[in-house]
C-alpha cells in the first residue's frame, strides 16, 4: 500500500512516495523484487520510533530519499497500523483506479478528496469526528495531535533507533545482532512474535 499525500491526492513537487508492506515478510525477497523491477536501492536502515514500536526496514530508492519502501521487522500493533490510516492509505488496485483516501497531513489538516480536488479542514478540536471519518481510533488521532503539536513547539526529537544496513547485510542479521546487545529491543520483539 502507499500512504500519505500520494494516497490522499494532495501531492506537489516535493511529495514523497512512501510504500508500506504491512506484513512481516523476508526483506531479502523485497529487495530482490525491487531490483528485478529495475529499482536501485540507495540506502537501507532499521528504524524504531520508540522502544515500544515495531522496528522497521526502510529501503530508500533514490539519493534524495523521497521514494521509500517500509517493511515491519516484527508484527505491528493495531495503533501502529492506524498511523498509516491516519495519514491516508490506499492499496495498489486503488492507486491504479485513481481512488484517493482521506487522511491528515503533518500540519494536522484533514484532506478529504473530492471529484474536483480536495477539501481541507483542521483536525485539532475535531478528534472524534476525524477518527470516525478515517475509520481509526480516537487514540491514534489524539496521539498524532500530541506528537505533531509538540514537534511544532520543540522541534523533532528524533528516532529511538536508527541502524544503517550495509550492502551485503540483511536487515534480519543486523536486527538480530542488535537484539543480542539491546535488552529493550529484545523485550519489544519477544512481546510481538
Predicted regions and their residues:
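Catalytic core of pol beta-like nucleotidyltransferases
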Residues: 2-13, 23-193
